[in-house]
Design a protein with these regions (language model features):
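Residues at the start of alpha-helices and the adjacent loop-to-helix junctions
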Residues: 2, 16-19, 65, 69, ...
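Domain-terminus/edge residues, biased toward the C-terminal soluble/receptor-binding domains
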Residues: 159-160, 174-176, 180-181, 186-397
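Active-site-adjacent loops and short helices of periplasmic peptidoglycan-processing enzymes
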Residues: 25-180, 184-193
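Structural motif marking the loop-to-transmembrane transition
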Residues: 3-4, 65, 112, 116, ...
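Short, Lys/Arg-rich N-terminal segment immediately upstream of the first membrane anchor
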Residues: 1-4, 56
Length: 397
């Protein structure tokens, strides 16, 4: 009896981190709405560490994302280059048509040479379309092959509402994404230290080119305009801006506020009121986030539920415990509660039972976070108990 009781109480509960989800909050006038004063029509704000969505609006609407596309281009270049110091020769194919479309360019001309790393900086910092095209042909061998690589990577990352048809993000028919998909891309890409370094750089100078014997000076589209127009983006660590007539002003960035590691993607901001409305939105959101804080809702080994487990000879109460702290980002003075969706009684079976349950966290009368946990209940060990279970199953057919 003592051995069986020991087995029962030794059951462990393991958090299934991959199944973490959050029901996003829509734009209403409440403490969780980070977008109520934004110009952007589409936005998502999430915790980079936990995936908790803090606030979102039209996050799954298919839209143009303009030069945010270049984050995928640079990521693929980093992941698929044998060496970032490899030299690329610029060809007419890489630059044809860009001036006619009034695309942002670094200024490379036919015959110039550049390293893959310099091209990554050029695509990321001043949003150079010529650099993005050069990376596409260098990495993919052709534009079409590279677009396929982009779409394959999007599928891998769960970007289910994204289709790429360019490396630079200029408007193309049938090309679209969502701010939620872009947040998935950025969250993944930030695990790559080279990507993180490039997109957090304010200035970079390339190797010498035909028209720039001392190298092309590259300046970030984020910090250059923030400094010029007085936007306070002190907490912003890095990111990428974008603009086309179809997309409006866009920005994807990461920031640290009150120990919260935030990822934000906003899109569709009009320039009718403010020229750099995407940067204005970043400032507004970061100011709002200053009143948010991390709060530990559950600590490791906290009991979230107790179940009654009945075997042939014994009945035992088993505590379901959390194996790690659960910390959420919350506005000031907002309390969070939780409920566990788990039956209170279980009976032993002929096999181990893997049980999943959902913990739902609620604040300000809305679901803000859900986490799935799993527990394993051992099979019936007693020989007479197993015989009875076999007979019951036989009778049931």
């Amino acid at each position: 009896m003592k051995k069986l009781r020991t087995i029962l109480f030794a059951i462990t509960c393991t958090l299934v981190i991959a199944l973490t989800t959050l029901l996003p909050v829509t734009a209403t006038d409440d403490a969780f709405d980070l977008g109520k004063n934004l110009y952007s029509t589409n936005y998502i704000f999430l915790d980079a560490d936990t995936g908790q969505v803090l606030s979102a609006k039209k996050q799954d609407e298919q839209i143009s994302i303009a030069s945010l596309t270049k984050m995928m281009t640079v990521l693929l270049a980093i992941e698929n280059s044998s060496s970032l110091n490899q030299t690329v020769t610029i060809t007419n194919e890489m630059i044809d048509g860009l001036y006619e479309e009034q695309a942002s360019v670094a200024g490379y001309v036919n015959g110039d040479t550049a390293t893959v790393l310099d091209l990554c900086y050029a695509a990321a910092i001043p949003s150079a379309a010529d650099a993005a095209n050069a990376l596409a042909i260098q990495i993919g061998g052709s534009f079409e092959n590279f677009y396929q690589m982009m779409n394959d990577k999007a599928t891998q990352l769960g970007m289910d509402h994204t289709v790429f048809k360019s490396a630079h993000g200029l408007d193309r028919e049938g090309q679209y994404s969502t701010v939620e998909d872009v947040s998935k891309l950025l969250r993944y890409a930030l695990q790559n230290p080279t990507f993180k370094e490039i997109f957090s750089t304010k200035e970079h100078t390339t190797q010498a080119t035909t028209y720039y014997p001392f190298g092309i000076p590259l300046v970030s589209t984020i910090w250059a305009y923030a400094d010029t127009y007085g936007y306070d983006l002190a907490n912003l660590s890095g990111g990428k801006t974008g603009y086309t007539l179809q997309a409006g002003r866009c920005i994807a960035y990461w920031a640290t506020v009150n120990d919260m590691n935030i990822i934000a993607v906003t899109a569709g901001a009009s320039t009718n009121v403010e020229q750099y409305s995407n940067l204005s939105d970043a400032q507004t959101a970061l100011t709002s986030l200053a009143s948010w804080h991390k709060k530990t809702i559950l600590k490791k080994n906290d009991v979230v539920s107790t179940i009654e487990y009945k075997s042939f000879m014994h009945t035992a109460n088993i505590d379901v415990k959390i194996d790690k702290d659960i910390t959420l980002d919350l506005p000031a003075d907002v309390e969070c509660t939780y409920e566990v969706d788990l039956p209170k009684k279980f009976s032993a079976e002929l096999y181990d039972q893997n049980i999943q349950a959902t913990i739902t966290f609620t604040a300000d009368n809305k679901t803000i976070y859900t986490k799935t946990i799993s527990i394993t209940l051992p099979q019936e060990k007693n020989i007479f108990g197993r015989i009875i279970l076999h007979l019951q199953n036989f009778i049931k057919g």
